[in-house]
Amino acid sequence: MNLHEYQSKHLLKKYNIPVPASEVVFNPDAAVDAAAKIGGDRWVVKAQVHAGGRGKAGGVRLVKNKEELKSAVKALLGTRLVTYQTDERGQPVNQILVEQTSDIARELYLGAVIDRASQRIVFMASTEGGVEIEKVAEKSPEKILKVTVDPAIGLQPFQCRQLFFGLGLQDLKQMRSFTDIVMGLYRLFTERDLSLLEINPLVITGSGELICLDAKINIDDSALYRQSELREMRDTTQEDEHETMAQQWELNYIKLDGNIGCMVNGAGLAMATMDLIKLSGGDPANFLDVGGSATKERVTEAFRIIVSDKNVKGILVNIFGGIVRCDLIADGIISAVKEVGIDVPVVVRLEGNNAQLGAKKLADSSMNIIAAKGFADAAEQIVKQVGVIA
């Protein structure tokens, strides 16, 4: 789950991490009131969307008076912001962050992620702040400093100092401030079950202060059950509607660009299914794992989600029956196809407990369901069926 910038900064303040004074607003008049509360004679207007690249897309604007402020907020609210990280439809702008301007002398990058290889939290820092860190990693990886956190003892102050001096900084007052910031970010990361935390940029002001000018936070979805405060911050308007619907039924769904819908029980089998579709000359339209308990209700909702994608020209269902009986799965598929009213070909491969009985039920049904003879046959059949339609 992603947070908006204003929500991320709300969390940073709770951990005593310095951020500029700001207010989130939902209409132009409120923006003027926010500016009066913040003070100053110049402000930064920031569209709140779950995407990077807002500045280049016109979603971040510097305004020099309250008339410009009101005009900028009015121009952004209710629009859809298209950046390099969104699709062509963009993301809806429903709120604006009005922020105090900062006297920027230097921009740095600071971030933390979970490294899957070492299974540990890794903190990263770079002198290349204010730019896309992915490009820095691609073109100049040596400019990214890293420290790995031992989970047995946690982040240590000496590791913060390693990053500080690695950035070419020397001022002792700044070192203490930097250490406090990084240690605070570590507490935030671990206590709130984050999967990604980025401060880009972390700025040094003209007076030598360190301020987190922008913040990006991703939370581990699997931990939301114990993060009630963060769970309430979810903005479903920024998420794919199909993925939101899938989450309500505990289905793991990710939309792709192809035209062959996939429904599989098990993430590993789902990935193998997509691979085999590609090898057979087709393109998967989604990743969808119905999990171990492929009940009739969940199968029905999975079909609804798949066919709501207008690009889908055929569906491949690949089920391995371990504890679940394949004949009961077949009954659920037949019932779901009838209930949803699917008019594209459906190829089903069943393997495991009562697979032959399940395949017979599919073959004997009057529905447009093809019972495949094996994994490879299933992929070839659906690619063939979709090719005929195309």
Curated annotation (Swiss-Prot):
Substrate binds at residues 265, 322-324. It is an enzyme of class 6 (ligase). Disulfide bonds: none annotated. Keywords: ATP-binding, Ligase, Magnesium, Metal-binding, Nucleotide-binding, Tricarboxylic acid cycle. SUPFAM superfamilies: Glutathione synthetase ATP-binding domain-like, Succinyl-CoA synthetase domains. It comes from the Bacteria. It catalyses: succinate + ATP + CoA = succinyl-CoA + ADP + phosphate; GTP + succinate + CoA = succinyl-CoA + GDP + phosphate. Its cofactor is Mg(2+). One of its GO terms (molecular function) is succinate-CoA ligase (GDP-forming) activity. Residues 9-245 form the ATP-grasp domain. Its EC number is 6.2.1.5. One of its GO terms (biological process) is succinyl-CoA metabolic process. ATP binds at residues 46, 53-55, 99, 102, 107. Binds 1 Mg(2+) ion per subunit. Heterotetramer of two alpha and two beta subunits. Belongs to the succinate/malate CoA ligase beta subunit family. This is Succinate--CoA ligase [ADP-forming] subunit beta. It comes from Coxiella burnetii (strain Dugway 5J108-111).
